[in-house]
């Protein structure tokens, strides 16, 4: 009634036999009839013609033949771009108009000397920080007396620090300053 397991394992599995009439195109047998030389020549000619048309036609060109962007660029090219010399006077005027003019009563109060431990208001600190930035992108100057540099520019390694910091400021490498690491290691 039951077969022993060893006999069932030794026996080869029966392959399911069903209708194998459907095949995919990729698994279909190759045609037994060889193509003629004329057929091969026509196929190669069509392929060469398609490649030639692709390489010489304007249909597949990178730049479109008509574009609104081209017209906008031509109009903007006629306008001169602002230069640093043309921007400086405008920036100075904005700063002067934005800065409140001190009255006679306020002037003596501002001239009082503050000690190093004196407490300043947040507005005064912001104004001082705006004036004492390490680098001014408008003029391209580096303020070596800026307290944010911690006096490194005037210390024992001052010249090395100036070279390294200048390299960092003017670096165009991404991420910023990657080409200046060795100079900072020397400091």
Curated annotation (Swiss-Prot):
Sequence motif Cx9C motif, location on chain: 157-167
* GO BP: any one term: protein import into mitochondrial intermembrane space
Q: Which cysteines are joined by disulfide bonds?
A: 146-148, 167-180
Q: Name one molecular function that GO assigns to this entry.
A: protein-disulfide reductase activity
- Main location group: mitochondrion
Start and end residues of each CHCH domain: 154-187
Segments in the Mitochondrial matrix topological domain: 25-43
The cofactor note from the UniProt entry for this protein is: Cu(2+) or Zn(2+).
Primary role: Required for the import and folding of small cysteine-containing proteins (small Tim) in the mitochondrial intermembrane space (IMS). Forms a redox cycle with ERV1 that involves a disulfide relay system. Precursor proteins to be imported into the IMS are translocated in their reduced form into the mitochondria. The oxidized form of MIA40 forms a transient intermolecular disulfide bridge with the reduced precursor protein, resulting in oxidation of the precursor protein that now contains an intramolecular disulfide bond and is able to undergo folding in the IMS.
* Protein name as catalogued: Mitochondrial intermembrane space import and assembly protein 40
